[in-house]
Amino acid sequence: MSGAVLVAIAAAVGNLLQGWDNATIAGAVLYIKKEFNLESNPSVEGLIVAMSLIGATLITTCSGGVADWLGRRPMLILSSILYFVGSLVMLWSPNVYVLLLGRLLDGFGVGLVVTLVPIYISETAPPEIRGLLNTLPQFTGSGGMFLSYCMVFGMSLMPSPSWRLMLGVLFIPSLVFFFLTVFFLPESPRWLVSKGRMLEAKRVLQRLRGREDVSGEMALLVEGLGIGGETTIEEYIIGPADEVTDDHDIAVDKDQIKLYGAEEGLSWVARPVKGGSTMSVLSRHGSTMSRRQGSLIDPLVTLFGSVHEKMPDTGSMRSALFPHFGSMFSVGGNQPRHEDWDEENLVGEGEDYPSDHGDDSEDDLHSPLISRQTTSMEKDMPHTAHGTLSTFRHGSQVQGAQGEGAGSMGIGGGWQVAWKWTEREDESGQKEEGFPGSRRGSIVSLPGGDGTGEADFVQASALVSQPALYSKDLLKEHTIGPAMVHPSETTKGSIWHDLHDPGVKRALVVGVGLQILQQFSGINGVLYYTPQILEQAGVGILLSNMGISSSSASLLISALTTFVMLPAIAVAMRLMDLSGRRTLLLTTIPILIASLLVLVISNLVHMNSIVHAVLSTVSVVLYFCFFVMGFGPAPNILCSEIFPTRVRGICIAICALTFWICDIIVTYSLPVLLKSIGLAGVFGMYAIVCCISWVFVFIKVPETKGMPLEVITEFFSVGARQAEAAKNE
């Protein structure tokens, strides 16, 4: 686990450089315009500041596709080189044109970092701390701004401040970032798997997780390569084997899955329910809140919510279902505690899959499973390294005459992956290992109370899909999972065709929508207004009495502004995986609205200057703190989680391009808006956008905390089909 943390910290150094650059140009431009006489030519002054935005926008148009082609690590190395070269060019800068070139190169580096660091961290982080690690870029970016403002403020106190030195000092941290990317950062294991480089991916995962056994996660990565596979939600009834009767409208006995508990003589069965629809499953297992909200809520949000919702009777978290691995059960009710459950017999024919061994193998695989087991038992049980509360046994109790056994592995965040293998005899009578079985179905350890009672029967829902297959020949040793087709085969074909997949389109709506609303929520306007606010609060007079010039005072004020963000971001890092992304957004956006409305009122109503300064200062501080807790990091975190591996780079590039275009629009429209509708009008407009943002998050943005990336993308696929089905009804 420490390996993933250190790798995320190293990658987030790139965002420190971004924040560093943003702050240094804000201070250096005060001296640049004096040297080049730009007071009468504000367009050139604005171009110097904006050239970094232009460079970031240009590079973003191709960064995602190239990252999917060449890898994440080479692009991060390139960004460090661009930072380094750009800083040296700015340090030299004999004229404005060379300075513009240096700013453009620097912008290229910024664009690559903003696009790729969230992808890289998401693809290397374990699910249980992915939110924390993906908040690091926000923290290091703000930290870089604070350090840079302090440096520029110190230089501004010199008799002859050098703007070239202010900008050129960037080459030192950029050189550090270069060495980190070249000698410390590994390639993303998910990208390696997508290219069929399995041994490299396995070694990287072993380093990131700090353990040798990463087979479960390797299987997960392969299973997550497909896009748009047919996945269905099925309903099951689980109960004691001798008590399940026809009264529960269950299928015939041949369809049952038999389970064995740890207690001798105790067995249970899971049987499919006839006629259970996807939407009926959601209505039973979804939250009571979503039922009250009616049809406005996206079914996708309800589906994700069912994973995290607490079961009211037992206090346990709902176990959830999962893709490409067959059946996975969502269970509530009283069950024997601390039991491990294994499959005994699975009936129901699976589909045939081609094998790269040729036509001599006609076996299919037993559907594997991913399950989430988060119950009230968590309080009583020690945490494992990867947060798994219950596990499957690698050797089944029922392994016997048929040569069947069950295997299972943790994949982080309390999730497990498991499948069943069979042994068969070849022509000479020798047993052949590793051939998948011919039937599908799987079951998970059940949460619950202290024993069986009246509530022996429980409802269960399963997300069932067909697996993406590959062969053990990929590793030339033990198999990683039940698959037969080389992973690189799944990445062939048109990327643009995959963008039309309903699940991908739904994810793009969420990602692009968040980026647009974030930029129009007012952060640039509040940053622009902050020096004026603090001046009114008397900070400027206090600093001038200390002998600090107005230019130096503005830099110090900006440093103080960024400093107050850091504790708030630290709190967000803690809450991102506890409360969740959606919850943080829904909680913090109302405070942004209130802060903006107070700023509107303070600028419309005539009041005592001291009262005005206090209200404005408190509002600005609250706005900054709660913005960086929610709307600052959450959009990038969510965008890095909701797209399939095959198109993750290009989809995040689309989201990042939206970010930069909106950033440019907001930056250049702000002076015009201030002149036309005034400060109160601008903040009022931002407050309206924040209200729209809250509604958008409430209706469209699901909770993704603690879920493996491959599970998230499969949920988007299922949710999109559910939404289409709901429209057609």
UniProtKB/Swiss-Prot annotation:
Question: Where is the protein found, in the record's own terms?
Answer: Vacuole membrane
Q: Where is the composition biased (Basic and acidic residues)?
A: 423-434
The reply on keyword Lyase is: no
Protein keywords: Membrane, Phosphoprotein, Sugar transport, Transmembrane, Transmembrane helix, Transport, Vacuole
Q: Might you name a Gene Ontology BP term for this protein? A: response to glucose
User: Which stretches are tagged as biased composition: Acidic residues?
Assistant: 347-363
Q: Which GO terms describe its molecular function?
A: transmembrane transporter activity
What is the annotated signal peptide range for this record? none
Family per similarity comment: Belongs to the major facilitator superfamily. Sugar transporter (TC 2.A.1.1) family.
Give the protein's recorded name: Monosaccharide-sensing protein 2
> Taxonomic lineage of this organism?
Eukaryota, Viridiplantae, Streptophyta, Embryophyta, Tracheophyta
